[in-house]
Amino acid sequence: MMCLGDIVGYGADPAPCIDTIGDRANLILAGNHDLAVAGVIPFDEFNPVARQAIEWTQKVLTSEDCDLLSNLPLQYVDGDYCFTHASPIDPMKFGYIRALEDVAEVFNHIGQKFCFVGHTHLPVLVRMSEKTGKMEVVRESKIMLEERYRYFVNVGSLGQPRDNNPEACMVLLDEDEPSIQFLRVPYDISASQEKILAEGLPSYLAERLLLAR
């Protein structure tokens, strides 16, 4: 199990999230909200809602929690695989990958066959022909992997999806089959919304969970 960052920063259960991910994940990468909460990067350019949530999170986490967040790696590369929270071109800049042109830049920068990212909260899979360089967005929830392609995968978001589907999103990589599959898991959104409101966090953060955008 791998977590590509932003464990904290929007929700009302930051400490339990850190504990759960810490217990279960083999790899945890740093997201920009994690590092903002830990005081590693400034958050003055974040939107007002995000700033308020970060300030609240800083108050409720322990110094040990913040130390853990501050020491998370930005990127992990293993053989054909590159994992990062945002663009791998300069991970500390947390650049967004929103268009095929951005994906092409990523493939020109890295040598790996697979690149897995998060950051935009929008699940997407793009494959690029090794021979021609042609890219296409794959719409199926599960695809079989082929040697002739390179793959860019945005894994979406567990805690705040933004693709009009409020269910938690994750990706299953099966190296034996081999395949990549997007999984959606329902959870108690109302309970999460109630916690956010009870803690005095911006109501938009609660509303957004159901709006999923």
Residue ranges and their predicted role:
Residues 1-66:
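Core catalytic region of metal-dependent phosphoesterases/phosphodiesterases
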Residues 1-6, 27-32, 84, 114-119, ...:
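Active-site neighborhood of phospho(di)ester-bond hydrolases with catalytic His/Asp-centered motifs
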Residues 9-11, 33-38, 89-91, 116-128, ...:
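Active-site environment of divalent metal-dependent phosphoester hydrolases
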Residues 16-19, 42-45, 97-98, 129-132, ...:
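Short, glycine/charged-enriched secondary-structure capping and boundary segments
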Residues 24-25, 72, 112, 149:
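Short, well-ordered alpha-helix to beta-strand connector turns
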Residues 60-128, 213:
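His/acidic metal-ligating clusters that form di-metal
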Residues 130-213:
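Acidic, His/Gly-rich catalytic cores of divalent-metal-dependent hydrolytic chemistry
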